[in-house]
Regions:
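Residues that form generic nucleotide/phosphate-binding pockets
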Residues: 14-15, 28-29, 99, 188-196, ...
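Extended serine/threonine-enriched, polar tracts that run as long, contiguous segments within proteins
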Residues: 152-199
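Selected N-terminal structured segments and early membrane-anchoring regions
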Residues: 114-115, 176, 224
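Short conserved micro-motifs at the rims of enzyme active sites and ligand-binding pockets
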Residues: 137-139, 182-187, 236
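Short, charged alpha-helical interaction segments and adjacent helix-coil junctions
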Residues: 2-3, 69, 73, 80-85, ...
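Accessory alpha/beta interaction modules
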Residues: 1-169
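Short hinge/gating elements
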Residues: 6-13, 175-176, 205-210
Length: 304
């Protein structure tokens, strides 16, 4: 079956707009039953500073971070942040740290028996990485929080509302480490993200060669097939790829400019230090000269 590559921001956005798929995706990764999912993509508009009338200027997909508020089977509300990061980039890491900090400061609207309320929710982060982490040899990793008694080092089977809101669990998917295994529900879901069997060099369209084990897997495959075969959607995906190329080029220019500015600042700092040293030497020479003049005047007066 021909499908669109779900690592594409637009494709992932399309999938997550389907409530059944979003719930299946989150339940599978988080390994818990979810009663409700309210997911909203956080779009960061992209504008080409050279030509605002261009097609890429109208494309609002350059960074698609997804925020979901969920209600678990035990009635607990949580906030899930989903980040697609295709390349290892320091700017992206710092951007998401700031983005995470902003969400820690926010209160979220939830529906309760008492009506709508605004509360600070526990946060869960999901990172879909397009690169490998060194020494982390697994396609899917859970970084969990534990309550450990530091006196006797025993794990405590408890929960504190305050602690839950000050710490968070993380789920990391390393897309390049996904292999052709379908033994578990998680492996079946991740098989759509496997970066093999592309039909051309663009990396946008691929063949999905595996059996579809259940209705939700078939639903995902059908949505990806539609995106991968509809001519208008294919053109939209190609546009996104071009916009991403422009974005990366401009990002490279920004990083280069930052590096050049750092070098220039270091040179200025060195020049200032050298000038300071020169001024100090001149001040010392001047003071020495003044001291000699003063001594000469004293000697002259003494001789008279």
């Amino acid at each position: 079956m021909i499908i669109a590559n779900p690592i594409s921001d637009l494709v992932f956005k399309w999938l997550m707009s389907n409530d059944r798929i979003a719930r299946f995706f989150l339940e599978t990764l988080l390994e818990q039953d979810i009663l409700e999912v309210h997911l909203k993509p956080q779009e960061l508009p992209y504008f080409n500073k050279e030509d605002d009338a261009s097609l890429s200027a109208a494309l609002t997909v350059m960074r698609l971070d997804f925020v979901a508020t969920i209600k678990t089977a035990d009635g607990e509300h949580k906030k899930v942040l989903i980040e697609i990061q295709k390349a290892r980039n320091t700017i992206d890491v710092m951007r998401f740290r700031n983005y995470l900090a902003e969400h820690y400061k926010q209160e979220d609207e939830i529906e309760t028996d008492k009506g709508k309320q605004y509360v600070a929710l526990p946060i869960i982060t999901i990172y879909l990485l397009g690169f490998k982490l060194q020494n982390v040899d697994t396609p899917a990793l859970k970084v969990a929080t534990q309550y450990i008694n530091q006196v006797n080092h025993e794990v405590m089977n408890i929960k504190s509302d305050l602690i839950e809101k000050l710490t968070h669990e993380s789920y990391i998917v390393q897309i390049p480490r996904i292999e052709a295994k379908l033994n578990t529900r998680l492996e079946q879901l991740l098989s759509f993200f496997e970066q093999n069997y592309f039909t051309d060099s663009s990396g946008l369209i691929k063949e999905y060669p595996y059996p579809l084990e259940n209705d939700l897997m078939k639903l995902i495959a059908d949505e990806l097939h539609y995106l991968g075969t509809d001519p208008q959607k294919q053109q939209y995906l190609a546009t996104e790829k071009e916009a991403m190329r422009v974005y990366k080029h401009e990002l490279f220019e920004i990083e280069l400019e930052v590096e050049e500015n750092k070098i220039a600042l270091e040179k200025m700092k060195k020049t200032l230090e050298e000038n300071k040293k020169t001024i100090e030497e001149k001040d010392k020479a001047l003071q020495d000269a003044l001291d000699k003049i003063a001594e000469f005047e004293r000697n002259k007066n003494d001789s008279q």
